[in-house]
Amino acid sequence: MYIAHTIDELRSHLAAFRRPAFVPTMGNLHEGHLALVKQAKPLGDVTVASIFVNRLQFLPHEDFDTYPRTWDSDCEKLRTAGCGVLFAPDEKALYPEPQTCKVHPDPALADILEGHFRPGFFVGVCTVVMKLFQCVQPRVAVFGKKDYQQLMMIRHMVRQFALPIEIVGSETFRADDGLALSSRNGYLSEAERAEAVQLSKALKAMAQAVQAGERDLAAIEARAMQALAQRGWQPDYLVLRRRSDLQAPSSANLAGEPLVALAAARLGGTRLIDNLEIDAMPS
C-alpha cells in the first residue's frame, strides 16, 4: 500500500491509473469502513482511502481534539483489506491557508435533521469532500448509508457541480445485535453498549408501524422518542421522511413512496445516529 502525505505525492502516484475508486474516512477504522474498501476494489483500477480528521465539520463543543487517532491499526487494516493507496494529509497539507472558499449545500437538505442540530456541519463535510475529490480525482466513490443525509448531500453536490464521479451507497454494517458500527461506539461504557441496540430497535418499530398500515406518522415518531427517553436517552430526532428528499411525507398519500426512518440520540455522553429504509407501500 502506497502512503501519500501530500497532494503532490498523491497525484504523482495516481497518474498511472485511469479509474481510482475512493473511500474517504476520518480513521479509527472498523469493519464498516473496511467493507467500503472491499466494495470499492472491483469498481476501479486502484482503491484509494483517505484518513483525515476534518476540523471544519466539528462544532466548538464537539470531539475534534479527542476523536480517536489510531494510525498504526488503521494502516494494518487497510493493507489487509487490499487498499492500494492511502492519502493521509496533515492539516497543513490539505488546508495550507485558511479555507475561506467553502461549499454551502442546499439549505433544504443541509439545514434539517443533522444540519439543524449541528449547524455548519454539512458545510464542513461538503468542503472537505470536494477538496478530497479534487486531490484524488476518483471515477467512483463509496459512502456508507449509515450517514444517510450525508450520502444524499454528496450526491446532490456531485450532480450540481457535474463532477464525473459515480457515488455508490453501501449498506450499513451492523454488529450481531443490530447496532450500526461507528467510530464513536468506542466511547460507550459496557452498560451503554448493551443499551445502544435500542436505537435500531426503535427504528424497526417505526418501520413496522408504517408497514402495518398506521398512517399517523407524528404519533409513530412521538412513540419512538418517548420510548428512548424513558430508557434514559436524550433523543434529538426520530423521524419518517421521504427517501427522495428527506422531507416529511403526507400521511394521506404514502402509497408508492419509499421512506426512511432516521434517528439521532445521545446515550450518556455519546451521540449515535442510525437509519432504516422502508419499502414503498403498495397503491
From Swiss-Prot:
What does the record give as EC number?
A: 6.3.2.1
Sorted alphabetically, the Gene Ontology BP terms of this entry are:
pantothenate biosynthetic process
* Assembly and binders: Homodimer.
The UniProt record gives the binding positions of beta-alanine as: 57
Q: What does this protein do?
A: Catalyzes the condensation of pantoate with beta-alanine in an ATP-dependent reaction via a pantoyl-adenylate intermediate.
Write down what this protein is called.
Pantothenate synthetase
Looking at the Swiss-Prot or TrEMBL record, what is one Pfam family this protein matches? Answer: Pantoate_ligase
Q: Which InterPro entries match?
A: Pantoate_ligase, Pantoate_ligase_C, Rossmann-like_a/b/a_fold
Main location (coarse class): cytoplasm
Pathway assignment reads: Cofactor biosynthesis; (R)-pantothenate biosynthesis; (R)-pantothenate from (R)-pantoate and beta-alanine: step 1/1
GO molecular-function term, one example from the UniProt record:
ATP binding
- What catalytic activity is recorded? (R)-pantoate + beta-alanine + ATP = (R)-pantothenate + AMP + diphosphate + H(+)
Q: Which Gene3D superfamilies match?
A: HUPs, Pantoate-beta-alanine ligase, C-terminal domain
